[in-house]
């Protein structure tokens, strides 16, 4: 890394390498193997290495999506490759084609979660994260309210505590599980900080400790329908409860260049910093033409806008890292982030 910008606080900076695409990079093939380049290198590792080489700031973490059906030796190869770049690897536990809110799908959801939790433990991961509280882009679901919403929370608590127990998380290296809500359209029920926090709070109450955290993604906050002020107030309450988790610096609607965020990253990041509980910030950018996200573009055309402005996506990520590094340093300079 060229590391021209030195971080001036203890907040850890990382990336989510979705800018490399799901199709052709993060998604394994039918044999559970990752795509490789002409040199035989796993593309996600090669892509992150390129970013390390051009980034003006040293980042220390990478949050990788691991899908059900990925061969264990392939996961091992990705983790070892990323660790060789002096990066700590955080596991994103992906699930698909199943509904965590439906009791009939509980066994299937747990079966998808377990192998990657076990891999995370084997590799010494200190945190895992997931959106495993609802099915992505479901065409069968309607928004759950009232008693139906409470039932969805209860089922999710049952499912996630079962996954913890069966994977042997208690007493392992995994210190926290970060739950991410998604914008309306991607989800129908858990579509805001407030609604996702209801699950996190219930899960921790059932467990007896604050193990589950709420991942705060600036883009989803911006698209959730709540105002900046409403999100700021919720973040303060979530942090006071000991349930504030990882922060994603990502632009609302476009999910592209951070300059397209309409002010949301700055406002939500500052709100998290003011709590004194901000620990990790990850820059997340998506390729606007990723075939895996076509369904989302059909729901929200703004997701298909090309915000690169003549750059490659790796260059857009490098600029995003610089942007967030300066934000963190200036939050520290103003005394908002305190060490």
Language model features: what each stretch is:
Residues 80-96, 150-169, 197-205, 270-274:
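Alpha-helix-loop-beta-strand connector modules within alpha/beta enzyme cores
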Residues 61-62, 164-266:
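Acidic/histidine-rich catalytic cores of soluble enzymes
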Residues 120-145, 170-185:
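Active-site groove signature of glycoside hydrolases
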Residues 280-289:
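Short acidic/histidine-rich active-site segments
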Residues 37-43, 61-77, 97-109, 136-140, ...:
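Acidic-and-aromatic substrate-binding clefts and catalytic sites of carbohydrate-active enzymes
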Residues 1-122, 208-213, 244, 300-339:
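N-terminal pre-domain/capping segments
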Residues 85-87, 125, 173-175, 275-279:
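A short helix->loop->beta-strand "cap" motif at the edges of active sites that frequently abuts
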Residues 139-164, 185-192:
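Active-site cleft segment of glycoside hydrolase catalytic domains centered on the general acid/base Glu
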């Amino acid at each position: 890394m060229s590391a021209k910008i030195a971080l001036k606080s203890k907040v850890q900076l990382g990336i989510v390498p979705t800018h490399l695409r799901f199709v052709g990079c993060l998604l394994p093939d039918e044999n559970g193997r990752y795509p490789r380049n002409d040199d035989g290198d796993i593309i996600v590792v090669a892509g992150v290495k390129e970013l390390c080489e051009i980034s003006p700031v040293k980042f220390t973490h990478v949050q990788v999506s691991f899908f059900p059906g990925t061969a264990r030796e392939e996961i091992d190869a990705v983790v070892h490759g990323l660790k060789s770049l002096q990066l700590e690897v955080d596991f994103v536990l992906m699930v698909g084609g199943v509904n965590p809110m439906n009791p009939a799908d509980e066994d299937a959801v747990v079966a998808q979660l377990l192998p990657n939790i076990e891999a995370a433990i084997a590799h010494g991961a200190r945190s895992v994260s997931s959106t495993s509280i609802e099915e992505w882009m479901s065409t069968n679901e309607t928004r759950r309210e009232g008693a139906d919403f409470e039932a969805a929370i209860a089922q999710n608590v049952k499912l996630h505590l079962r996954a913890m127990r069966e994977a042997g998380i208690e007493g392992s290296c995994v210190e926290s599980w970060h739950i991410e809500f998604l914008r309306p359209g991607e989800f129908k029920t858990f579509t805001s900080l407030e609604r996702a926090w209801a699950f996190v709070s219930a899960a921790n109450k059932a467990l007896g400790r604050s193990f589950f955290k709420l991942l705060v993604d600036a883009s989803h906050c911006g698209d959730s329908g709540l105002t900046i002020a409403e999100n700021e107030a919720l973040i303060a309450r979530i942090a006071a409860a000991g349930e504030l988790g990882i922060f994603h610096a990502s632009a609302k609607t476009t999910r592209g260049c951070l300059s397209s965020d309409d002010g949301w990253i700055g406002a939500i990041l500052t709100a998290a910093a003011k709590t004194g509980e901000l620990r990790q910030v990850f820059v997340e950018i998506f390729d606007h033409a990723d075939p895996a996200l076509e369904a989302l573009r059909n729901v929200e055309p703004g997701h298909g806008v090309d915000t690169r402005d003549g750059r490659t996506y790796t260059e857009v990520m490098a600029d995003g890292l610089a942007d967030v590094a300066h934000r963190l340093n200036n939050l520290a300079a103003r005394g908002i982030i305190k060490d």
